[in-house]
């Protein structure tokens, strides 16, 4: 891995703890519209930040952490087991398979798949239903707080564990091999070191 790239990585907060917690604790409802590919943290950020996730028919997700020799971040290890169950979460995190939009809805990781041309308008309309005068903003904020606040300590701990793992893995031969293999467009040959 290039030294100038490694110099940009803050080893103290690779999992983006502060960012993830800030998004998760946002009082106002947040809606996400995914209109194409969402790889790794791009999707897990939506899990942390969004109250509702809507997908274009063209959207898909890949969680390539293990294929790169790194650990999941942005709370992936916190959210996925709670949303999917432990074994399904492990399957998604261990194997970098492409997950199409309909499968994401079936798994409970998104709310709906929409025609690409209708995605943003639908998401906007749903957002308008959550704010005054159509939505009871105080009620929604109170319910969101009641659902999220008990989880903050656990999420914080999971992010600490992700940071610890990422700090070690970024110095590993497997990480270097994962990145090199991706750049060279070949399958990685991990050594476990």
Protein language model annotation of sequence segments:
Residues 19-25, 33, 39-93, 122-127:
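CoA-thioester-processing core
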